[in-house]
Structure formats: structure tokens, C-alpha cells
Amino acid sequence: MEKILVTLSTGAASIAVLAVLFTIPSLYNTINEVHDEVLDGVSVFRVETDSAWTEMMDIQITVTPPTKPRVNPFNSIFRQKRQTFSGLPAWCQCEPTKPTCPPGPPGPPGQPGQPGTPGAPGPKGEDNTSTYAPITCAPVSQDCVKCPQGPAGPEGPAGPAGPAGPDGQPGAPGNAGNPGSDGQPGAPGDDGQPGAPGQDGQPGAPGQDGQRGSGAPGAPGAPGNAGPAGPAGQDGAPGQDGQPGPAGPAGQDGAPGNAGSDGQPGAPGGPGLPGNDAAYCACPHGEDSCDHLYRSCLPRCFGEVLDGVSVFRVETDSAWTEMMDIQVTVTPPTKPRVNPFNSVFRQKRQTFSGLPAWCQCEPTKPTCPPGPPGPPGQPGQPGTPGAPGPKGEDNTATYAPITCAPVSQDCVKCPQGPAGPTGPAGLAGPAGPDGQPGFPGQRGNDGFPGAPGAPGDNGQPGAPGQDGFPGQPGADGQRGSGAPGAPGAPGNAGPAGPAGQDGFPGQDGQPGPAGPAGQDGFPGNAGSDGQPGAPGGPGLPGNDAAYCACPPRSAVFLSRH
């Protein structure tokens, strides 16, 4: 057992050693490739920044610098150092002089203001002391105006007839009438007393035998009792397919996508914008120190360096493009005043004349022409109240006396009016006088027959009637048997039988419509960076001290300026 364990351990150790031997060269090659990529990226970055700085300096030289500040008066007394960086600016001018545009012409006059408030009333005028005679007019007559009488109205309708006069004198008596005819016969008298009953008849012969009768059907019988429970029903047929179900709920969010593939190698970036003043500093002397620095921080800073270089490249490309667009449209400012001592003292050989004499970090703004006339102004404020009016003059004008018009006493002659309406009916006249006595009446007609007389007395009772004949004997009847009655009403329903077996399950219904799509999954992990672009061409060599900081004395001049 121990030999087996030792053998297995030895084999595993040998496999591990072989794996390490194969892995170390691969790791070494990977580290070298990463190192080469970093060096290539730094080299490309350095070449691009050198090229951008050179182009920026060329553009800066073509632009006329702004007015130079006051020269230090002690420069002509004390000797300057040879390496004075006189070609560099003594201050940082990060913004050129802004153009001053003349104001546009004044706008048209505004709308007239609101009228001022009325002035205070003037002082009270002098009282008028002149007197006038009282004016009296004739009183107006209150009498009624007398007009002529109008025409009479039309005659009214005839009045109602008067009451009837009193009865006249009675006429002479007429002749006697003829005697009346005989009256109708009287009603018959009441029936007499009934006669005595007759003797009993002889018994009749025996009747014939009767036939067997058939009675009428009897009445329906009472409902019978409830029957026993029926047998269990047969199994039901399979049910029909169900209706399609409603749409299912939205699915859950999808799983995060896989990591994206590596991007295509980026194109070489364009030249970047110039940095701020003193942004470009000299590199340390010797390439060994830089190589040692990159080699020592390679495992830790490789990803950060590549990300920073990529972001910087994109930003510099965009900024440089915008600066070029602005630089083309810029009008250069006024050239600064020439130093009068340049012709007296010999200039240093290393003057850095190729560099600008100032740091112009912003393009010169264009000179603006006078703007168009402004819009009409706002309506003016309401005017101040006017001054009180002058004192009123006394009214010395005279007026003609007031005369009243004469009042006419004549009758107002009105035109004749239309005829009046018909008058009401007159009152009933008085009763007329008594009439004359009437003439004697004619002989009267015969009278009608008299009413029937009263019924006579009851008659004598009649004689007893004769005995009747004996009747025929009836036949003996047989006992009849009626027909069976109608069937009785159906009995109450028996108890329900046991439930039948369940039918076969119906087929599944159509599947419901697909639910809404789930939310998009989380974005996949970012793909690895693409291969670096091809290195750009070598840039132009920079001027001397192009990447050096301003000398310390620049701060003094900056404070004085």
C-alpha cells in the first residue's frame, strides 16, 4: 500500500514539475509581449504629442501676439544671465484681449406714456353778488277742457217679452158628451178546490230482464309512492377541448449576455490640442530609468496606462479638431510694441526666437461689427400729475329775461270719435191688460173604455178524477261492473342514483398566446481592448526648451503685471 502511495505521489509531482516547466516560458513570452505593447503605446503617444506641439507652435508664430507688458527698468542696469530664457514669456497670458464692440444705435422711441393724472382744481372764483328779478309765470288752468258732445250711439236691441197677462173670463159651457162604451171582461176567478184522490190501480205484470250495463270510468286513482332509485348512469362522453388559456405572464429577465468579442484595432489618433502653460515638462535624463520604471510597475499599471492612453487619444483628437476650426476663423490681434533696447544691446545666441514670447492659451476673439438697431423700447412710465389750473375768471355775462309762454284758454277741438258700442238690452216692459173672454169650446169626444172589473168569486170544487191504468213492470237489473279508471298521476321521483364514473379527460386546449418578452438581460462583460493602431509617423523635432517650465522669475512679473 505504501509503495502505491509513493508511486502515485511521485507521478503527481513529476506531472506538476513538467506543467511548471511548460508554463514558465509561456508566462515569460506573455510578459514580454505586454512590455512591448506598453513601450509601443508610449512611443506612439510621445510621437503624437511631439507632432501636436510642433504644429501648435507653428500656428502660434503666425498669430500676432497681444500687447507686451511694461518692460522691467532694471534690465538695462544689471547684466542678465546668459541662460535667461528671454525667449520664453515672463508671464502666462491665458486669455487674449477681448474685442470691444461699439454699442448699436439707439432703438426707436417707445410708445407714448399714459396720460398724467388730472391737475388739482383751481381756487374758488369770486361770488356773484348781482341780483335778478324773480321770474313768475301765469298759473296753469286746472279746469276740464269742454269738448262738444259726440253723436248718439246706435239703438239697443229689443228687450225681453213681458210676463203673461191674467186669465180671461171663463167661456160658455159646452154641450154634454155621449155615454162611454162597455168596459172589457174581468179577469178569470181563482181555481176551485182539488178533487178527491182516485183508487189505486192493479199491480202490473213482471218486467223483462235488464241488460248488463257498463258504468262510466271511475275517477283517477291517487298518485303512487316514489319508485326505487334507478341504476347508476353510464360514463359520460369525453369533454370537448377547452378554450385557449390567457396569455402567460411576462418571462423573467434573461441571464446576462456573454462577454463581447474584442474590438477592432483603433485607427491612429490625430494630433492633440496644445496643453496649458508649463504643462509639458522635460523627461528624466536617461532611458534606463524610464525602462526600469515601466518594468517595475508593469504588472500593476498596464491596464491603467492603456485605458488612460486611449481616453487621452480620443480627447486630444476631438480638442485638436475644434481648435483648428476656431483658429481658421480667428483674426490675429495687434502686434506688440517692439522693445527699443533690442538695437542697443546684443541679443543672446540662444534666444529661443522660434518660440512665442507669450502663452496664448485661447484664440483671439473676432472683432464684432456694430449690432443692428435694438428693438423698440418699452412704453414709458405714466407722466407726473399736471400743475393746478389757473384761477377761474368771474362770469360777467348778462342773460335775457326769461318770459313764460301765454296759456291758451280756447277749447281743444278734438276730432269726432268713432261710434260707441251697442248699449245693453232694455228692462222688461210692464204686464199687459187682461184679455177679452174666450169663445165657447167645441163638443168633447167620447171617453175611453173603463178599467177591467175585479175578479169574480171562487167556483165550486170539481169532481174526483178516474183511477189511472197500471204501469208496465220493469225488468230486473243486473249488477254492472264499471270500466277500469284512468291511470293515476305519476309518483314522486325516486332518489338520485349513484354518480356515474368520470368520463375520459378532454384533450388539452390550444396553448395561449406567447407572453410579452422578458426584460433585456444584463449587458455582458466589456470585451478586451482591441489591438493598438499602427504607430504614426515620426514628428518634427521640437525647438530647444520647448518642454521646459517657465523660470521662477515669471511669478514675480506675473504679480507685477
UniProtKB/Swiss-Prot annotation:
Pfam families, alphabetized: Col_cuticle_N
Disordered as annotated region, ranges: 100-134, 148-271, 367-398, 422-540
Organism encoding this protein: Caenorhabditis briggsae
Coiled coil regions in record: none
Keywords: Collagen, Cuticle, Disulfide bond, Repeat, Signal
Compositional bias of kind Low complexity: 164-209, 219-265, 422-467, 486-532
Signal peptide limits: 1-30
Gene designation: col-145
SMART domains (alphabetical): Col_cuticle_N
Subunit structure: Collagen polypeptide chains are complexed within the cuticle by disulfide bonds and other types of covalent cross-links.
Region (Triple-helical region): 102-127, 153-276, 413-544
One Gene Ontology molecular-function label: structural constituent of cuticle
Biased composition (Pro residues): 100-112, 367-379
Domain of life: Eukaryota
Family, as annotated: Belongs to the cuticular collagen family.
GO CC terms, sorted: collagen trimer
Name this polypeptide is given: Putative cuticle collagen 145
